[in-house]
C-alpha cells in the first residue's frame, strides 16, 4: 500500500582496551560524521508541535464532509485511505458551539487538549451516520527536520483516541477493535511512512484506559534530514472513532557513557560505571526539571539474554558485578532516558529516549606462575567436577 502525498496530502561504540594495573573498557556517544556542523540547540526541533491555531496556525486542504479541512502549518498530510476530517480542535468545537461567532479566539466550548489552547483533531467520516458510521482511516502528519548524520534524536508527544466515541457508561468499542496511535521517524529522511526504514512506536489503548498517552522513540540520524510521522490508523469501521494529537516534540537525545574495569588483585570483580548528558536541547526547555535515569545491563553468550544490574537509577553511578569466567567477553550497556520526576518541572512532561552506550570487556585471568614437581614424585592431573564450575 502506498501513501498518497501532496502539499496538503503530502556505534554502537566498541571500547578501547586499556591495561595498566587494571583492565578498562570505555564507551561514549558517537561523534557526528566528518564534515558536519553540530545542530543549533533548541527546545523543540519541530515546527508547530503544539498545533495552536493562534500561534503557528493552520492552512486549508480539500473539502471533506462539506468543508475544507485544516492542516497545521509546518506539516504535510499523507493518507493510505480516504481522508478523514482533520481540523484545529479549538476552531472545530468553538464553531460547533457557536456557528456565528465561534473560532480560534473564543472559549465557549470544551476542547480536548493537553497543552496550550488547541490540539489537532482527527475524526472518521460519517462519525455517527447510519448505516455505516465511523469509516476506517489511516492518516499521518509528516515533517522533515534538519539533522546531523550520526547524532541521536528523541521524539516525544501525546495522543488520545476514542473508539466508540467519548461515552463511557459503558463504552461500546468492540473487543479486539482499536485505533493505533503511532509516532515514527525515518532516520534516512525518506517520506514514505510504509517504508521499512521508519522506526515506529505505537499505543492502542482507548481513552478509558489511561486517557492521554505519551509516545516516544529515539533514533540516530543517517542523513541531513530526518522525517517525523504522527499517525493514527483506525482500521475498523465503528461509530464515534476520533483522536487528538498534542505536545509533539523532538530534541537531540540524551547520551550515556559506560566503563568496565577489573583489577589484577581481583579480576572477577568487574566495576561498571556510567555517566551521561542531557544534551544541548533538553536544558533549554522552559521550566523543565529533567533528570537522567539509567538501565544498566550485561550479557554473556552463555546467558542468551541481557541481565539487569540497575533499573531506573537516578544519575551517574557504579555497580560491581561478580563474573564467573575469565578470558571471555562480556558486554555491558547503559540505556538512558530523560524525564521529570513526579510533581516537578513543566507540564505536560515529556520522556526522551537516549542513545544507548555499549562496550565489550574481557576480564583477564592472572598469569600462572610455573611450578616444579617434587624430586622423585610423578606429577598428577586433577580434573575439577563440572558441577563446581562457576556460572559465567
Regions found by a protein language model. Give the residues of each.
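Bacterial N-terminal signal peptides
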Residues: 11-23
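Aromatic (Trp/Tyr/Phe) and Gly/Pro-enriched flexible surface segments
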Residues: 28-149, 156-160, 165-183, 190-218, ...
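Proline-enriched interdomain boundary motifs that mark the N-terminal boundary
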Residues: 254-262
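Conserved aromatic anchor
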Residues: 268-288
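Extracellular low-complexity, O-glycosylation-prone stalks/linkers
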Residues: 285-307
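Short beta-strand segments within Ig-like beta-sandwich modules, predominantly Fibronectin type-III
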Residues: 309-316
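Beta-strand-rich modules
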Residues: 323-343
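Extracellular fibronectin type III
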Residues: 339-366
